[in-house]
Amino acid sequence: MKALNHFVVRVDKAFNDTMEVGDKSIYLDSKWNEFENRICYGVIESPPTRHNTGAKKGDTLFFHHHVTTTDNLRIYDNLYVASYGGWKPHAIAYRRKKDGKIVMLGNWIFVEPTEVDKTDQVTESGIVMQLGHNVKDRDVAKVIVPTDYMKEQGVNSGDVVGFTADADYKMTLDDGSVVYRMIEDNIMYVEEK
């Protein structure tokens, strides 16, 4: 199969629908915690031949969660189409098979949450205010992989950025690591060092 403008990816399992408890497997309804249990990656069967993405057959594509849940994006069996280019593309990034490097596509970026230590405080009257520990700060994140455009603007991996509310979406990658994806337009500022 030869894709022209889109990626064709093989996704063997669209949901994490099993859970191991001891020596037993529990099967989960895919609608339970649906967003948390979607698998948003697959093996590239064909990169788009009309675009020079650098991706190769066998690399791993990370994509928008709609790819495996939208009927018209399924070709057959476990093959799906992930759009590339245009407005709001499905293809987010790919991991090169040869060296494991993640390459961002379009205007998507990966970030990780910054941890905010909100230690308990004691008021003058002795009341302990439990604020919790290591709570994710929802509007600030550390850039993992910036786009080329962001690099041109001086934004690099490790920089802390502020972003618009609810712009980040949690994704679990093929190696089990958790990232948040967003579009570079959602970045409002870069903290100065």
Model-derived features: where do they sit?
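Acidic-enriched and Gly/Ser
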Residues: 1-193
